[in-house]
From Swiss-Prot:
Residues 446-467 have a biased composition (Polar residues). It holds the Pfam family V-set. The modification Phosphotyrosine is found at residues 429, 453, 470, 496. This is Tyrosine-protein phosphatase non-receptor type substrate 1. Immunoglobulin-like cell surface receptor for CD47. Acts as docking protein and induces translocation of PTPN6, PTPN11 and other binding partners from the cytosol to the plasma membrane. Supports adhesion of cerebellar neurons, neurite outgrowth and glial cell attachment. May play a key role in intracellular signaling during synaptogenesis and in synaptic function. Involved in the negative regulation of receptor tyrosine kinase-coupled cellular responses induced by cell adhesion, growth factors or insulin. The keyword Repeat applies. Residues 31-373 are extracellular. A motif (SH3-binding) lies at residues 439-444. Ubiquitous. Highly expressed in brain. Detected on myeloid cells, but not T-cells. Detected at lower levels in heart, placenta, lung, testis, ovary, colon, liver, small intestine, prostate, spleen, kidney, skeletal muscle and pancreas. Residues 336-355, 409-421 have a biased composition (Basic and acidic residues). It comes from Homo sapiens (Human). One of its GO terms (cellular component) is membrane. InterPro entries: Ig-like_CS_Receptor (IPR051755), Ig-like_dom (IPR007110), Ig-like_dom_sf (IPR036179), Ig-like_fold (IPR013783), Ig_C1-set (IPR003597), Ig_sub (IPR003599), Ig_V-set (IPR013106). The chain crosses the membrane at residues 374-394.
């Protein structure tokens, strides 16, 4: 007898159970086979470029969307949701609308250092009401290779004088990776006294660098520059440079020199104050006379030196006639808001101004009088010479025009020959009559020492008759030629005749 089979009413439920179990086992097998694969462990992208993050799934089961996150844990940031949301910087690599598409890679455009981090591709299973995270990829670390910003160099807040040490700082930000090189230069010469720090110390999406250098100032640093140079892997070509001009940092104090110039006018002395080698140009000068302010002025027209410093000169006219005593002149300079520096000069007043003026006038008058005397003397000398020459000519002409002679008559008086024959020596005499014409008076004060005389000599002769001898004396031949007239008196001279009377 055949065994009885299952009742027809019980066969339906059993088939349903078998089908359900079969479906359950197949679903579990699909879930166990699903894998989310992120093949790239890290991606390095330059700032401004587009980063591609790859992700694939091995199965479409379970049903549910794919989402991208940056970071893990509760604070993770949603980057892309396949199901919903608006993400303008994110695009998918493949067309997710295609059937059986299992490529869930994305692209992120215009990358910035802030985008750096680890990105995760996560598979969700459809649930009600919310989807449930099913499986996540291993993650891809996105590194942004960012260029450093242009270095900014800053100096001290206040100016410093030469021989002082000042500090300069250099800063650059937003670069990645962390490795960076920084150097300092002054006028092309590398500096060694500086310290550099890169922050933060640990991992970060971007970094900053800060460096401080020490520089010793000199008087020639007005045109000098300090340079901060930054080199990074993201830079192509020359490194970045930041500069600072030492002209914004240095202050060169002036040197003063006060000198006295020659007198420009009567009783006025020019005193100059030369302000040399100063920087910057801001300068105020004050003149003091014996401590009292005389004039204040601001440097306007200055002369620039080759080293960038300036020169300026101020002058002061001092009226010495207004001072009885010596004057102390002071040139006081205030430069760039600093305490005033000064230089003094003592102006000597040797005598009372009026006496000095009188002496000067007397000297001028004496000089003029001497000149007048010289001129008058020369003229008088010429006139006297002409007058003497004229007198000489007149006198010569008068003498030639006279034409008369001086006659001398010698008389022998009556004598009683018989009465006086007894006398062996006859007495003979001569009467010398020398007629003279009037001479022109050459000068009132001129003496006329003129002597005319006759000498009679007797000598023994043989006895003979008395002889009467006449002698005519020509005045023309007796007169010597007179010397030329001169201011001195004429020398005296003598005119004489010798008559010899022989005895009989």
């Amino acid at each position: 007898m055949e065994p009885a089979g299952p009742a027809p009413g019980r066969l339906g439920p059993l088939l349903c159970l078998l089908l359900a179990a079969s479906c359950a086992w197949s679903g579990v097998a699909g879930e166990e086979e699903l894998q989310v694969i992120q093949p790239d462990k890290s991606v390095l992208v330059a700032a401004g470029e587009t980063a591609t993050l790859r992700c694939t799934a091995t199965s479409l089961i379970p049903v549910g969307p794919i989402q991208w996150f940056r970071g893990a844990g509760p604070g993770r940031e949603l980057i892309y949701n396949q199901k919903e949301g608006h993400f303008p910087r994110v695009t998918t690599v493949s067309d997710l609308t295609k059937r059986n598409n299992m490529d869930f890679s994305i692209r992120i455009g215009n990358i910035t250092p802030a985008d750096a981090g680890t990105y995760y591709c996560v598979k969700f299973r459809k649930g009600s009401p919310d989807d449930v995270e099913f499986k996540s990829g291993a993650g891809t670390e996105l590194s942004v290779r960012a260029k450093p910003s242009a270095p900014v160099v800053s100096g001290p807040a206040a100016r410093a004088t030469p021989q002082h040490t000042v500090s300069f700082t250099c800063e650059s930000h937003g670069f990645s990776p962390r490795d960076i090189t920084l150097k300092w230069f002054k006028n092309g010469n590398e500096l060694s006294d500086f310290q550099t720090n890169v922050d933060p110390v640990g991992e970060s999406v971007s970094y900053s660098i800060h460096s401080t250098a020490k520089v010793v100032l000199t008087r020639e640093d007005v045109h000098s520059q300090v340079i901060c140079e930054v080199a990074h892997v993201t830079l192509q070509g020359d490194p970045l440079r930041g500069t600072a001009n030492l002209s914004e940092t240095i202050r060169v104090p002036p040197t003063l020199e006060v000198t006295q110039q020659p007198v420009r006018a009567e009783n006025q002395v020019n005193v100059t104050c030369q302000v040399r080698k100063f920087y910057p140009q801001r300068l105020q000068l004050t003149w003091l006379e014996n401590g009292n302010v005389s004039r204040t002025e601001t440097a306007s027209t200055v002369t620039e030196n080759k080293d960038g410093t300036y020169n300026w000169m101020s002058w002061l006219l001092v009226n010495v006639s207004a001072h009885r005593d010596d004057v102390k002149l002071t040139c006081q300079v205030e430069h760039d808001g600093q305490p005033a520096v000064s230089k003094s000069h003592d102006l000597k007043v040797s005598a009372h101004p009026k006496e000095q003026g009188s002496n000067t006038a007397a000297e001028n008058t004496g000089s003029n009088e001497r000149n007048i005397y010289i001129v008058v003397g020369v003229v008088c000398t010429l006139l006297v010479a002409l007058l003497m020459a004229a007198l000489y000519l007149v006198r010569i002409r008068q003498k030639k025009a006279q034409g008369s002679t001086s006659s001398t008559r010698l008389h022998e008086p009556e004598k009683n020959a018989r009465e006086i024959t007894q006398d062996t020596n006859d007495i003979t005499y001569a009467d010398l009559n020398l007629p003279k014409g009037k001479k022109p008076a050459p000068q009132a004060a001129e003496p006329n020492n003129h002597t005319e005389y006759a000498s009679i000599q007797t000598s023994p002769q043989p006895a003979s008759e008395d002889t009467l001898t006449y002698a005519d004396l020509d005045m023309v031949h007796l007169n010597r030629t007179p010397k030329q007239p001169a201011p001195k008196p004429e020398p005296s001279f003598s005119e004489y005749a010798s008559v010899q009377v022989p005895r009989k």
